[in-house]
Amino acid sequence: MRLVVIGVNHKTAPVALRERLALVGDDVNIALAQLQGFSDGSVIVSTCNRTEIYALVPESILSPNTLLASSALSVVESSISLNSSTNISSTIISAHILKIKTWLADFKQLSLDEIDPYLYVHRDMHALTHWLRVAAGLDSMILGEPQILGQIKRAVHLAQDQKALSNQLGWIVDQVFAAAKRVRNETQVGAQAVSLSYAAAKLVTQIFDDLPSRTLLVVAAGEMNRLVAMHIAGLGVGRIIICNRNPERAEALAAELRNPKRQIEVRTLQELPQVLAEADIVSSCSGSMDILIDKTMTLRALKSRRYQPMLMIDLAVPRDIDSTVSRIDDVYLYSVDDLQHVIAGNIEQRRQAAVDAELLVSQLVVEMDRRFQVRQVGKDIQQYRSRTHEQVDKLLQESIAKLQGDNANPEDIMIELTRRLTQNLTHAPSKLMRKAAREGDNELLDFVVSGLQDAHRHH
């Protein structure tokens, strides 16, 4: 398949090294352009948890003539059998992998010795399996997380824009995306929430089904509440109110959440008692040492809103919302401990689902390999027919030239042409039959013989 992957992730390298190896922004465009000089297509996936280079070893360096002439063999030719094309191909691919590693070290101004212990390498079907596991979220820090598939798609689009996605690599990418979709659809590996922000958003969908008509109140604009707000906004909530001590941070979050179909308002924390009555959903995570929403404030807000249900999510430690609020009818209060308990159960469910997902990945890789072999055989047949036509045309032109000479004997020329055509057409199968007989490969021998007999019967 000629596919190789070289990379680091959260399991193999510390964050300090991952930061130094990250390929982002203009670095990716430059890197893709440079990789094109010695690869038949490449895709770079770089996130906070991984940097990976997916590349195709050039077909030209794996051609039979190039294999034997390659300078890469000089390093290890004494330790391999030059009669083994498999060993030679493996050596060439290893040399190419080393070339990519060296390039990466140079590109990031690091030494190869510095990064090599942390790099992992996969090739051919192992590389395909790895790519599918990554796309399906099976190799993520958070098992089954869906964001990685979107990150890979963006990486592929960037490779397309930079003309770095060859036809074969594009075909492989399509297979990976289709297979990853099947893993997610046919298993439960990504079905349950395993982050606080995602779990909070899941609660919203369980209690409210008419989100465009609902209001979310975000109390404090820190990172955790930002994630919660982003998740709930993505579900289609119609109005968001942000209360924060720092108006600049509140405005920054409002800018992220702003949408023509969504109303966004920024209020001060002092206005919290007044705006609480307008909220169907409250998410609070302030870091304050004091209670921000007590039972009295909640009862007043509930009365003002005619006792319509309220969902309150308290992600703060210490708590922002008085725990006695949970005793009020029509108020659903969830603390960080409540969500952690839900997440713990969901993580275990994902682990169990991952067993099924890994089995499905193995099956899908076998299917992809078969499709690739069929695709490759079609290409090989086309090349074989093209070479055969070239040989026949060459012999025919030589014979025509001889026929135009003085004292040409057409009968002798035609006999010679027939003999040479026969030799050319029977050379490869004859060589294969002798090799099969010499190595005791009766299955291959029977296959070739029966194939030739079928060919004779049909002609």
Swiss-Prot record:
GO annotation, biological process: protoporphyrinogen IX biosynthetic process from glutamate
Class of this enzyme: oxidoreductase
Residues that bind substrate: 47-50, 140, 145-147, 151
One example GO MF annotation: NADP binding
InterPro entries: 4pyrrol_synth_GluRdtase (IPR000343), 4pyrrol_synth_GluRdtase_dimer (IPR015896), 4pyrrol_synth_GluRdtase_N (IPR015895), GluRdtase_dimer_dom_sf (IPR036453), GluRdtase_N_sf (IPR036343), NAD(P)-bd_dom_sf (IPR036291), Shikm_DH/Glu-tRNA_Rdtase (IPR006151)
Originating organism: Psychrobacter arcticus (strain DSM 17307 / VKM B-2377 / 273-4)
Enzyme Commission code(s) on record: 1.2.1.70
Similarity remark: Belongs to the glutamyl-tRNA reductase family.
Keywords, comma-separated and alphabetical: NADP, Oxidoreductase, Porphyrin biosynthesis
Catalytic activity: (S)-4-amino-5-oxopentanoate + tRNA(Glu) + NADP(+) = L-glutamyl-tRNA(Glu) + NADPH + H(+)
Listed HAMAP family: Glu_tRNA_reductase (MF_00087)
Site (Important for activity): residue numbering on this chain: 130
Residues bound to NADP(+): 220-225
Domain notes from UniProt: Possesses an unusual extended V-shaped dimeric structure with each monomer consisting of three distinct domains arranged along a curved 'spinal' alpha-helix. The N-terminal catalytic domain specifically recognizes the glutamate moiety of the substrate. The second domain is the NADPH-binding domain, and the third C-terminal domain is responsible for dimerization.
Quaternary data: Homodimer.
Extra remark: During catalysis, the active site Cys acts as a nucleophile attacking the alpha-carbonyl group of tRNA-bound glutamate with the formation of a thioester intermediate between enzyme and glutamate, and the concomitant release of tRNA(Glu). The thioester intermediate is finally reduced by direct hydride transfer from NADPH, to form the product GSA.
Pathway(s) annotated for this protein in UniProt: Porphyrin-containing compound metabolism; protoporphyrin-IX biosynthesis; 5-aminolevulinate from L-glutamyl-tRNA(Glu): step 1/2
Disulfide feature: none
Biological role stated in the UniProt entry: Catalyzes the NADPH-dependent reduction of glutamyl-tRNA(Glu) to glutamate 1-semialdehyde (GSA).
NCBIfam families, alphabetized: hemA
The protein's name in its UniProt record: Glutamyl-tRNA reductase
Catalytic residue positions: 48
